[in-house]
Amino acid sequence: KGVDTYSIIANRGEGGQNEIGSELGNALGIIRTRELQEASKVTNVTLGILSESINDPIYDFGFSKSPDETLAKWGEQVVYERLIRKIRELRPDVVIPAFLNEPSTHGHHRAINVITVKAFKDAADPSVFPEHLQHGLRPWQAKKLYVPADEKDYTVRVPVGEYDEVYGASYLQLGEESRFMHKSQGMGRHYDEGPSFNYYKLEQSTVPSKARESDFFEGIAYTYDDLAREVAGKPDGETLARELSTLQKDADDVIAAYPRFADVAREVHDMLSDVQRALTVVQEAKLDEATRADLTHRLKVKERQLYTASAEALSLVAKVRPETGELVAGQTATVKVTAYNGGQVPLKDVSLKLNVPEGWRAKPLGATSFGQVGYNQTVTAAYEVEVPKDAPLFQPYLPPSITADVSYKAFGSTAVSRVVPSDAVAVLPPFSLSLDPGAAVLNTLKPQEPISVKVTVKNYQPGAAEADISLDVPAGWTVEPKASPLAFAAKGETKSVAFTVKPSAAVKSGTYTVTAVARAGAKESRHGAQVIRYPHIGTTYYVQPAELMIQAFDLKVPEGLKVGYVSSGFDNIDEYLKQVGVNVTLLSAKDIESGDLSQYDTIVLGIRAYGFRPELISSNARLLKYVENGGNLVVQYHKPEDNWKPELAPYPITIGTPLIEWRVTDENSKVTMLAPDHPIFNTPNKITEEDWNNWIQDRSAYNPSQWGKEYVELIANGDPGEKEFTGTFLTAKYGKGTYTYSSLVWYREIPALVPGAIRMFVNMVSLKQ
């Protein structure tokens, strides 16, 4: 129907899992933001995100069962103000939350439903966030609020299975094409052509409504003729009504001209002239301010739509191309703006304007205006861009730093096409620093054990460069060497330097930070630039402090402990086991199928391993035989769809469904140790209540609902006010060995260096000893 549509998203998915790479946390949020942006292009939807910056309060803190928990963690007033602001900016006629507030739904989705329903009326109340008026945002009352429904109880049925001959797909298929962009979440399905419907129920309305409606806009002024009838009785209403009726005829003419592109362009530009004239009439008319604001907004939206339609109909291809997207403060670079005319209509008075941030300088290197551009011709304007010496480092959630406006005249009216570079243009640190390891354990039982740190440095300055690399360490600690000079022959060259950090002999338990520093004259870098590059989202960056977090606590690790680790690709616990002194071998398919498993004291299966290591299914009998002969097998959480079957365990274990009901999301929830004398809680590390403190995001995921009586139930734990689970941590003797199944979220806690989680995991892999 050509309705101007917006998708407002709360957070950026930082707390999820990554199905295409190793990025987690903020880096994953950056990927998912770019995926949202690309998905929005597919469906021609304008994207808005309430989370505004890295580590914003509206953060994906992981799975939540309730809207109350979500709003408490986000700050209800923070998220509500931003949603009300969006509604007042966009002034929608119809509002639809994507999810219902029901127990089977993620708490983040439920929270947005709750505040969206509330905002339907509050956005129109001038006493709600009155400060918006100071920024030119007037209260706004949407006409209707719908919520998702089903075929048993609905108001509107949307035929998403209808085939669109222009797009060559059904709307359901187009939607899935958009969902396929969310590759980090594994989204997207293939649907055949054929009837399909989405259902929605009218929840609130300010206009007369019926039990069944033909579409969302029944009873709402939908066409320019509808608007003309609404304003006809107002002061200067007859003049306005004539202008609006003219626009209705224009719109009909545009549609009738399709697919004759040149004719479409002519009608678009006729309508553009009429829209711009109507805007002037609205400003001069004796209207009440609410009506003036409404008409102005609608006409501005139409003007923007016509700009897009003009470029499409004229086959205008506009691009902005920096010689490099990787800049540093003080650098000068060339940026080119091009306009190609692929249509038969000559473009006149073509202007290529480069837009840069305040404080930047963009100097034309030649012509930027061209009298006429004919069919199959390209014009180019080159600019010398100077980045100020105090330019802030790249922030991935801000609008693009460089854009271009291509303006041109056709059929007597001027249109503007705004373009952005295909990849991010980023101000990066002159020297990007990364530390390996990125997090480290300091065992206070061995305080003088040195920590080896490798600093990798990438030169982002144009040309050759030199820098002295050093580490800032806590007071009383030492580092060798104190500094190391590096010389780079060209931009993009990467070199590494090794340091040895020695903690103070009196180091106490706690968190310490080591920072990498690159100094080159007056320039100093203390940041790293993580390059994030995938085919479906292009290139972007995560700039963050170049820091190594060190967690100091006491940890006993048996000598000579040998562990085989079967990775699913979704966790990196093996790296941290190595770091604390465990001899870890990553097991290949061949190792699992035919290798000597008896050489390992313990074999650990990473999260969801049965779903992503098919050899585990065919070799499961070998694993159980390994246990029976005296081995120690540790299995981390699985979902039913990970090929999990109860009989994979030596005694049956059934995973609870629906999955949403079988997890503990409060990382601070009380844990009771049901078998406090079990070796897992005593050997080699004594586990106390303190070891359950400072966990992050969750306690457990996808807990078992049934298990054999042979298992020892190690803990009881549940979210506040809910039943406790006793199948979260199960262990059993099998033959001469031990089998342990745990749905505690070790994969989150151990990389976060949670002391209790690391101490318990070491105990778990030490059971044979």
Predicted region positions:
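Low-complexity, acidic Ser/Thr/Pro/Gly-rich terminal tails and inter-domain linkers that flank the onset
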Residues: 291-330, 420-444
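A glycine-rich, often tryptophan-bearing local segment used as a flexible ligand/cofactor-contacting loop or short
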Residues: 608-693
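Aromatic-Pro/Gly-enriched surface loop or interdomain linker
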Residues: 524-606, 637-639, 659, 663-664, ...
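Short glycine/proline/serine/threonine-rich loop/turn segments at secondary-structure transition edges
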Residues: 387-403, 505-513
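Metal-dependent de-N-acetylase/amidase catalytic core
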Residues: 65-317
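Catalytic beta-strand/loop cores that center a nucleophilic Ser/Cys/Thr
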Residues: 659-754
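Proline-anchored loop/turn motifs at beta-strand termini and strand-loop-strand connectors
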Residues: 342-375, 388, 461, 465-491, ...
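Active-site rim/loop-helix segments in enzyme catalytic domains that contact anionic ligands
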Residues: 1-89, 110, 117-121, 125
